């Protein structure tokens, strides 16, 4: 259980931060990890997982080590990373150094734990002093708190030391309490690791345990933590470039929508204009035909109202050479009817002649509507 707790906390707190640009003389103990064509700080730090130092040189060479330089940065890092030109990956004789503080603190805490494991009191004191700096000390303090024993009601904290006896149920409860506190601690670390901060990492765990004579136990856990997660230059640049690309894509989509809307409106207006133009043309055509018909009728009436010249005949005399036939049909009582044909001939320049009529008398055999024998 202690190993699992230490592993989870170590994974949450492990993160490389940029330390500075150092010359090759100011840093030692480095081992070349790889030379990557698309090198970046994030790729190199992934390759150096488990080491305290990750260093980049010549734009594409990655080195790992465990010796953190203590001097001030004195190098000149002007070479851009081959995989991410927005950040620098060392120079011709300088390293861009990134440090994993959790790995450095793990080494310090393990040495402190081995030097103070002789007695229970010393272990408890060591766990109190190292709780704010490492996860290994948190597991050791949980172990020391589980060994506290008492037969009377008490109130203890992580920083206190007690050696009075208690029952085995309290020990199990203390172990459970420590695992709960470590779980809450890892959750807090996960949530805080998404933000960038410049404050130093620190965490404090306070466990208050109250035990009654009837082995009834009440535990209150207070966890306060502030973890610094410095975002590397590559991660910040990647986030900004992704945000700008997202904004550009959003702008293009809005422009496309606006273009579609404007095009639709213009197309509708064009169709409406063509329709109105066609209707206007049809109306003009109809008006022209009506005007032409009126002109023709007027000319015909004008020509018919004029007297034709004397002595003219034929087509040149207008309607004077026309012949009108009128057929009248009727029915009278007592006979089948009669047909009268009237012919009138217009002589040029004169009134019509007297009509020549031909009367057809019905056959008397059909008088009364019955045939006569």
Swiss-Prot record:
Feature: compositional bias, Low complexity: 110-171, 183-204
Positions of the WSC domain: 15-101
Domain of life from the UniProt record: Eukaryota
InterPro entries linked: WSC_carb-bd
Region of interest called Disordered, as start-end residue ranges on this chain: 101-171, 183-210, 291-316
Protein name: Uncharacterized protein in LEU2 3'region
Organism: Pichia angusta
């Amino acid at each position: 259980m202690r190993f699992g707790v230490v592993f989870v906390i170590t994974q949450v707190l492990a993160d490389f931060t940029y330390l500075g640009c150092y010359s090759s003389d100011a840093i030692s103990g480095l081992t070349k990890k790889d030379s990557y064509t698309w090198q970046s700080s994030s790729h190199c730090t992934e390759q150096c997982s488990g080491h305290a130092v990750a260093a980049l040189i010549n734009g594409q060479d990655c080195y790992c080590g465990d010796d953190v330089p203590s001097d001030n940065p004195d190098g000149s890092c002007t070479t851009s990373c081959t995989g991410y030109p927005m950040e620098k990956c060392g120079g011709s004789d300088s390293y861009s150094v990134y440090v994993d503080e959790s790995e450095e603190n793990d080494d310090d805490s393990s040495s402190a734990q081995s030097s103070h494991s002789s007695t229970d009191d010393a272990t408890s004191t060591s766990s109190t002093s190292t709780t704010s700096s490492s996860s290994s000390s948190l597991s050791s303090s949980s172990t020391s708190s589980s060994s506290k024993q008492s037969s009377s009601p008490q109130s203890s904290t992580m920083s206190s030391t007690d050696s009075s006896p208690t029952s085995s149920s309290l020990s199990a409860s203390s172990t459970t309490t420590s695992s709960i506190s470590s779980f809450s601690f890892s959750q807090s670390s996960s949530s805080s690791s998404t933000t960038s901060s410049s404050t130093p990492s620190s965490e404090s765990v306070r466990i208050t345990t109250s035990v009654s004579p009837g082995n009834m136990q009440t535990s209150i856990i207070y966890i306060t933590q502030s973890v610094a997660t410095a975002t590397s230059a590559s991660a910040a640049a990647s986030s900004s470039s992704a945000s700008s690309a997202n904004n550009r894509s959003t702008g293009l989509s809005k422009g496309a929508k606006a273009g579609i809307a404007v095009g639709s409106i213009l197309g509708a207006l064009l169709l409406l204009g063509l329709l109105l133009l066609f209707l206007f043309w049809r109306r003009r055509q109809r008006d022209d035909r009506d005007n032409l018909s009126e002109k023709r009728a007027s000319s015909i009436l004008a020509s018919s109202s004029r007297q034709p010249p004397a002595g003219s005949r034929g087509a040149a005399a207008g309607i004077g050479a026309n012949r009108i036939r009128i057929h009248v049909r009727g029915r009278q009582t007592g006979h089948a009817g009669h047909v009268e044909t009237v012919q009138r001939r217009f002589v040029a320049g004169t009134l019509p002649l007297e009509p020549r009529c031909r009367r057809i008398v019905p056959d008397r055999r059909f008088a009364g509507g019955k045939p006569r024998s």
